[in-house]
Amino acid sequence: MTMNETTSSLLEPDRDWWRGAVIYQIYPRSFQDTNGDGIGDLQGITARLPHIAGLGADAIWISPFFTSPMRDFGYDVSNYVDVDPIFGTLEDFDALIAEAHRLGLRVMIDLVLSHTSDRHPWFVESRSSRSNAKADWYVWADSKPDGTPPNNWLSIFGGSAWQWDPTRLQYYLHNFLTSQPDLNLHNPQVQEALLAVERFWLERGVDGFRLDTINFYFHDRELRDNPALVPERRNASTAPAVNPYNYQEHIYDKNRPENLEFLKRFRAVMDEFPAIAAVGEVGDSQRGLEIAGEYTSGGDKVHMCYAFEFLAPDRLTPQRVAEVLRDFHRAAPEGWACWAFSNHDVVRHVSRWADGVTDHDAHAKLLASLLMSLRGTVCIYQGEELALAEAELDYEDLQDPYGIQFWPDFKGRDGCRTPMVWESLPDGGFSSATPWLPISQSHIPRAVAVQEGDPASVLHHYRRFLAFRKANPALAKGEIEFVETRGSLLGFLRSHGNEKVFCLFNMSDEAATKELPMKRLEPLEGHGFVSEILDHEVKLPAWGAFFARLA
């Protein structure tokens, strides 16, 4: 019996658990420190799992904790099958899984398969010569006759995507940092090695994966130049506007059709184990939803994907929400999306969409309820349940190489990665040492312990609405049909079997009234919102919502 069979036996053997689930993302460096080094660790996650279970989440997603030189804080892996000592040990991970399963939480881990660290033994061997056993495990190419890179591909972190290696006298591809060389998945041996990594963690007991940069796995064998992207098609959803990466149409350096066959192989391994699921991160500013549709259709690749439509700086409006949901349905009528408003890579959404907001908490509660009412699976990022705003850091405190590169026009990702606040203490209850990133003092009044004592807090609202979602399966798994609305109102009907739930949201700082679009509506309670019904109209306060069952 594998560890997966042993620990997963504590959970219901539901192969469809992921559909409509609520997944809580943990950034381990910033969650809880237990050994006093200022960096969060696996034992800290285990200690805080009751908080997540108490929210009502179904699963956790843990950002990378593998052995790494930490140039990109774990997204540069030097050993896929071990835990970095700053986070703990494999035994600590086993204990984490056991406790999560005891609490009814499934565990998903973040796999970074498109690239490794330049310290990974595979790359150390690959760069040593052109004739070694792993010479073709990474993407190597000769220079042009004048010594310049093989083509015009750009790194998302700035500059050319090619780095010269003086030993091989060739360039290697890096879509991200120069210390993150891209693996060559055209090589069958590389695919086998990555599938072995997948199997290792499944046998260890994980319930699924978040697949980082899933559309970057393959590159064009011919290394053709990317075409220019006309200005009117550019947007800043996956890279900041100051980054020239947005000036290209990325049809050759990523989004390659060969990826579909590899994802089928990855899925086949998952299907050997009970109740496993994967969510893919699709990073593309023009074709994100289309690619997400390709990767989730057919039931033979990944179970769900998320693109950056709701992680982008674009203002969230009723029209935008409806547009994104409809676009995804057109791209993938049989696919499944995973929606998030915040994560470890973007400005926290309560700050990103704060223009014109006067009631921070009401705004946060409305956005949480909207997110958890959309058709799809939901990801919540740590601290989101506290309505934490983006932290402001001085340049001297920055750790993120992305922010350092583009400062001050783009301040990087550190502002959303500052430590979690548990207690109303200067250190937030995070660590007894100086934390790796400074704790925002504006976060302290929003600590878990503070909000626990306030039934009207955002934390209590998250718990309340998660329970409401579970009590109404149409919100988790139902179809969605948008209702005609105007101005700041967004309305839709969620349908699952015989259950139909009408949802109405006021996405503004001013009260709004809506004529009820259907008769025989029975208002629902337990969601935390108050509205006023007069005749056939419902009046919503600023940042208010209304839910009713169609009788």
From Swiss-Prot:
Major enzyme class: hydrolase
Active site (record annotation): 212, 272
UniProt site (Transition state stabilizer): 345
Its EC number(s): 3.2.1.20
InterPro entries named among the record's database cross-references: Glyco_hydro_13_cat_dom (IPR006047), Glyco_hydro_b (IPR013780), Glycoside_hydrolase_SF (IPR017853), O16G_dom_2 (IPR045857)
Catalytic reactions on record: Hydrolysis of terminal, non-reducing (1->4)-linked alpha-D-glucose residues with release of alpha-D-glucose
Gene Ontology annotations of biological process type: oligosaccharide catabolic process
Species whose genome carries this gene: Rhizobium meliloti (strain 1021) (Ensifer meliloti)
Molecular function (Gene Ontology), one example: alpha-amylase activity
Protein's recorded name: Probable alpha-glucosidase
Name of the encoding gene: aglA
Record has Hydrolase as a keyword: yes
Family stated for the protein in its record: Belongs to the glycosyl hydrolase 13 family.
Keyword terms of this UniProt record: Glycosidase, Hydrolase
